[in-house]
Regions:
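A short beta-strand element within beta-rich, extracytoplasmic domains
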Residues: 88-100, 255-264
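Surface-exposed beta-strand/loop patches in noncatalytic accessory domains
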Residues: 66, 101-141, 272-308
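C-terminal membrane-anchoring or membrane-association module
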Residues: 405-431
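Membrane-proximal extracellular "stem/stalk" segments
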Residues: 245-401
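Extracellular and analogous surface-interaction loops
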Residues: 71-73, 77-89, 148-153, 237-239, ...
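Noncatalytic modules at the cell exterior or secretory-pathway interfaces
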Residues: 87-89, 146-169, 253-255, 322-340
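N-terminal export and membrane-targeting signals
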Residues: 1-11, 397-409, 424-425
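Non-catalytic extracellular/lumenal accessory regions of secreted precursors
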Residues: 26-80, 99-100, 121-135, 169-243, ...
Length: 431
């Protein structure tokens, strides 16, 4: 009997091992691992690419692709886009410094797009702000085909250059930063539409949405952003942590958000400016607006500035904030709690509440003469709305696939185990 029990124990042990190894099915993001775990969840399957010091050697970023790279503390790195003469192209660069690094107030990432003749198509930069807390930040570049833009209209190679804004600034450490790059294209419209931004919209500051808060845990990156829709959402956030949420906003709809940071009973006193930073990014991960919420241990809140409804013609606006609201899709809310909060009030966690309002009925958008890349990035689907209501990303069946793989492996091994047990039992009876 002892022999039979030992054999079964070995089989069940092997079953447990097989199950444990079968469950994690998500791919690991490409690129070398750093000594300190990254605070950012890179896209599964992101392709590793090394930026070139010269545009002559710049690696290609294919439209619709996601890439992982790195940015040295000094100098520029370049990448190439091969574009046609009719599509708008966008590239987002998310810079991820190590949590152990230090940054200056104005340090950040700068993204420039130029054509093969050296003409500048766009420039954008994002900084860490007064809290000087290292965290993932994103800047975007673009090549637009627009009646008001005479440059960068030719087909051919265009170059994306990425650099630090203030690598030598006081308090900035010389560490290299990880990068996530996403290249996108937006097709031209089938019909000629307005060539000026809408002149009138409701710019009154809306009242924060009321109601009981529902728990919704934030994601750790753009691709893993937790879907939410209109509502009051709460999560816990720790100093140095960054949380990502995705809100579907359709054509004609207007988003407004208030962020609240709850009080603490630590008894400590002090003040951290812009302790909670909330940034709204558009579907191309372009910066739309942000708000900083200071913290003295008591509850405090802040709201994004009033924003116009999403409209294709917003791209013709003179202000970058309005121009960024140029397409429908998932708008990202990225919340970061400054590391400095821990110095005064401890490691937390601290309760964070997001009051999200999406006003207006969805309207018909422009008729595009083709598909965007990635497909569907500039639209809101029924699946997107369902995902926002349920809090699970559309098409995210990772957990189910893990369960299926684990279940099949476990079931098969158990059947084998029971079969062996039966054989051993019969042999024992025969003896």
């Amino acid at each position: 009997m002892a022999v039979r029990l030992g054999a079964l124990a070995v089989i069940l042990g092997a079953t447990a091992t097989a199950t444990a190894t079968a469950v994690p099915v998500a791919a690991t993001a490409a690129g070398p691992a750093s000594a300190t775990p990254s605070p950012y969840a890179f896209a599964d399957g992101a392709q590793s690419v090394e930026g070139a010091r010269s545009t002559g050697n710049a690696p290609l970023l294919k439209s619709g692709g996601t890439y992982k790279s790195s940015l040295p503390s000094s100098g520029k790195v370049s990448y190439r886009l091969d574009l046609d003469a009719v599509s708008n192209a966008y590239v987002s660069v998310t810079a991820v410094p190590s949590p152990d690094s230090t940054v200056s107030v104005i340090d950040g990432v700068k993204v420039t797009v130029q054509d093969a003749e050296g003409n500048t198509c766009s420039t954008d930069n994002t900084s860490f702000g007064t809290a000087r807390s290292p965290h993932p930040i994103a800047a975007w570049g673009m090549r637009e085909i627009s009646p008001g833009k005479a440059l960068c209209r030719k087909a051919g190679a265009h170059y994306v250059t990425v650099e630090r804004v203030d690598p030598d600034g006081e308090g900035s450490s010389p560490d290299a930063w990880d990068l996530e790059l996403v290249a996108m294209t937006e097709p031209r419209t089938a019909k000629t539409g307005p060539t000026s931004a809408p002149g009138v919209w409701n710019s009154a500051t809306p009242q924060p949405l009321q109601g009981e808060a529902e728990r919704r845990k934030g994601g750790a990156g753009f691709t893993g952003a937790t879907p939410i829709d209109q509502g009051v959402w709460q999560d816990d956030i720790r100093p140095g942590q960054t949380l990502f949420y995705a809100v579907p906003v359709d054509w004609g709809q207007q988003i407004s958000v208030t962020a609240e940071l709850g009080s603490t009973d630590s008894g400590s006193t002090g003040y951290t400016p812009d302790a909670l930073d909330l940034t709204l990014y558009n579907p191309a991960r372009g910066d739309v607006a942000d708000v900083g919420v200071g913290y003295n241990g008591g509850q405090n809140s802040g709201s994004l500035p009033p924003l116009p409804p999403v409209d294709h013609a917003n791209r013709y606006a003179a202000t970058a904030q309005v121009s960024a609201l140029r397409f429908a899709g998932s708008y990202y809310l990225v919340a970061h709690l400054a590391q400095g909060v821990a110095d005064t009030y401890g490691d937390g966690p601290f309760p964070m509440t997001l009051r999200v309002r999406v006003s207006g009925q969805p309207q018909s958008g422009p008729e595009y003469a083709g598909e965007s890349e990635p497909k569907g990035v500039f639209e809101v689907s029924d699946q997107d709305r369902e995902a926002a209501a349920e809090g699970v990303a559309a098409g995210d069946d990772t957990a189910m696939r893990a369960l299926a793989v684990g279940g099949i492996g476990t079931g098969s091994a158990l059947l084998v185990g029971l079969g062996v047990w039966t054989v051993l039992a019969r042999r024992g009876t025969a003896a």
